[in-house]
Amino acid sequence: MINESYRIVITGYSGFLGKNLMERFNNSEFLLIGRDHKEIERIEDFNPDFIFHFGAEIYNQEDMLDSNIIFTYKILESIKDIDFKAFIYCGSSSEYGLKSLPMKEIDLLEPRNMYEATKGSCTLICQAYAKMYNKPIGIVRPFSVYGRYEKEHRFIPTLFRKFEERSEITISPGYHDFVHIDDFIDGVLCFCFSTTDKIKGEIINLGYGKQYSNYEVYEIFCEVFGYNIGLNRIDSLMRDFDNNNWISDIKKAKDLYNYSPKYDLKMGIKQIYDERNNR
């Protein structure tokens, strides 16, 4: 927990990442910004210490230009003339596109769809504002974050539900670099409490640095629960955004920002398992 009191602006406050971030700042005052562009006008008078831009349109392609790019631009315009400790934009590992090696922050962005393109565009806009106005504006790129408050339709919560019900699960191919929500938030905090020069225009990957296949994740669940459930493998089904390589290079985050993820995937699944069984 961050016991000091800060004034914090946050978008995406009702989402998985935003909720967990807010819980760390337990004594702070928040200005919560939704999707109404008019709410951005409140930021300057609020005089924030930190701005966390975690909100984004993921599903509706028609809304992505306005909700992602224009919204980000307007927030940056609203803060360019005020002093603050850090503005952190939550990008996405999907900005990289398909790579054959662990993904580095300096890699070329090769988006494959509108969401990835808008996230990559916002990253570049944030970097431009950081340089134009000499501001501590930085970007975090989360990989496959999992943990409390994650939406129930996602892979890890689905596995928990299926194992608790002891019902069959269908799994297709895919690889992910899973990072526990507590490790992700720790990384965000290491970054945002850095000096201006270490934030300004910088990007850091926040993953664990190891990838697992979906089938390996299933096996970990079998170990944690102590029993198997029926598995329907569909090896021929590979989605557009799936890849045989999806792993973060986290050397920069470790070396420059003391990022040190604590939970390997089995430890993280066991931690959530214990939480769910002690409710």
Spans of model-derived segments:
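Conserved Rossmann-fold NAD(P)-dependent oxidoreductase catalytic core, especially the SDR/UDP-sugar
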Residues: 74-114
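Conserved catalytic-core motifs of eukaryotic protein kinase domains, centered on the activation segment
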Residues: 60-65, 98-102, 151-152
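NAD(P)-dependent short-chain dehydrogenase/reductase
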Residues: 124-190, 218-225
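C-terminal substrate-binding subdomain of Rossmann-fold SDR/epimerase-dehydratase oxidoreductases
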Residues: 167-279
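Active-site helix of classical SDR
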Residues: 114, 118-122
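SDR active-site strand-loop-helix element
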Residues: 11, 51-55, 87-93, 140-142
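N-terminal Rossmann NAD(P)H-binding glycine-rich loop of SDR-like oxidoreductase domains
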Residues: 2, 6-26
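NAD(P)H-binding glycine-rich loop region in Rossmannoid oxidoreductase-like domains
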Residues: 39-70
